[in-house]
A protein has these predicted regions:
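Metal-dependent peptidase/peptidase-like ectodomains
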Residues: 1-3, 158-276
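Solvent-exposed loop/turn segments at secondary-structure junctions
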Residues: 30-33, 47-48, 61-65, 160-164, ...
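His/Asp/Glu-rich mid-to-C-terminal helical/loop segments that flank catalytic regions of hydrolases
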Residues: 278-336
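Phosphate-handling active-site elements
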Residues: 140-153, 178-180
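Soluble metallo-hydrolase cores and metallopeptidase-like ectodomains found primarily
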Residues: 1-124, 137-140, 144-147
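Second-shell loop/turn segments in exported
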Residues: 24-30, 71, 78, 82-83, ...
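Beta-strand segments within the central parallel beta-sheet cores of soluble alpha/beta enzyme folds
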Residues: 54-56, 150-158, 184-187, 324-326
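Soluble non-cytosolic domains of exported or imported proteins
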Residues: 31-32, 51, 116, 125-133, ...
Length: 336
């Protein structure tokens, strides 16, 4: 105190200025560990023999956290819709003069309804609140049926998907049932959008993909089991769900490598047949604007009913889907 202010502590007054000093300090930052848990529900099968086999249905319960500072919701929404239609999948583009004129005009129109709302929370309504709720709805539905599927159903809400498939990796490394007793895994990740105005992805040759009223992307359904892929198609038409399946993101060598980027992969690498259901990307992907008011709930309901019928078919058929595709090395790397 004497060196900086020239007086002892007892003589200091508020606002006093002292001399400049140089300080060397070593600061060590440590993040405290937090436990993250998968949530697993089991519905026992009704057949004494087949009940020891399992159909796994999953989603992920995490998202990407918070922003360092609050941003204006309308500004983020309009900017991404015009400049970054694939959200975080796009490069950090800044836009051009024509786009900014369009942004300013749309913001001015929105401001007529009141001031903007600042937000710093990535809610993840579609990614993957939609899939998580779809799995919960299926669990409740099957639990209320008088006649349960012959095989048991495993409902799994994976933690840490956004950190690198942590929860699904842990689940398949330490499964609560014998790993080879899981006959298939159905993964729902982002099933709440898919409109004609959404850029849902890119084809392998760089063409934009767009959604529509009956839109649904499938990834991986025939990579390990042709039989599973055929079953998914048969249920879609036979049960009159009438989705138009888009397989463009499942192309071999696709640069987005989506087959390796969601929880189904951690099952597939152990040669468990999988299907990844998604309505695809959009301008709110990993953005503050991924909020519930933008979910297409009737479309999400249709996806949920489709997957429930597929799970029931897998649960009741005589044989498990045969693995006839190229088997994977669970310790190897993933390349679509």
């Amino acid at each position: 105190t004497m060196r900086i202010f020239g007086n002892g502590m007892q003589l200091l007054v508020p606002g006093a200025l002292g001399a400049k000093v140089n300080v060397k300090a070593l600061v060590e930052m440590q993040s405290p560990p937090f436990a993250a848990r998968n949530v697993v529900a089991l519905l026992p099968g009704s057949d004494p023999t087949l009940a020891s086999q399992y159909v796994a249905i999953g989603a992920h319960s995490d998202h990407v956290g918070t922003a360092r500072r609050g941003l204006d919701h309308d500004s983020v929404f309009v900017f991404n819709r015009i400049v970054r239609p694939a959200g975080a999948e796009n490069d950090d583009k800044m836009g051009n003069a024509e786009q900014f004129a369009q942004i300013n005009a749309e913001l001015a129109e929105r401001r007529k309804n009141g001031p903007g709302r600042r937000d710093s929370i990535f809610n993840g309504a579609d990614d993957d609140g939609s899939g998580s709720m779809a799995v919960l709805e299926m669990a409740e539905y099957f639990a209320t049926q008088k006649v349960k599927p012959k095989r048991s159903l495993l409902f799994v809400w994976h933690a840490g998907e956004e950190k690198g498939l942590w929860g699904s990796a842990h689940f398949t490394e330490h499964p609560p049932v014998p790993r080879d007793s899981i006959v298939a895994q159905l993964n729902l990740d982002m099933v709440g959008r898919g409109s004609a105005t959404d850029q849902t992805g890119m084809s392998a040759d760089g063409k934009e993909l767009r959604g529509g009223p009956d839109y649904l992307q499938l990834v991986g359904s025939r990579r390990l089991s042709t039989e599973l892929g055929d079953l998914v198609e048969r249920v879609n038409t036979g049960k009159k769900h009438n989705f138009s399946f888009d397989y463009a993101m499942d192309a071999n060598g696709h640069p987005m490598n989506i087959y390796c980027r969601s929880d189904h992969y951690e099952y597939a690498k152990w040669n468990i047949p999988v299907t990844f259901f998604t309505t695809g990307g959009h301008s709110a992907y990993h953005q503050l604007t991924d909020e519930p008011q933008y979910i297409d709930y009737p479309h999400m309901q249709r996806v949920t009913r489709l997957v429930a019928d597929i799970a029931a078919e897998l649960g009741n058929r005589a044989n498990r889907p045969a693995v006839d595709g190229k088997k994977m090395d669970p310790r190897g790397s993933c390349k679509q």
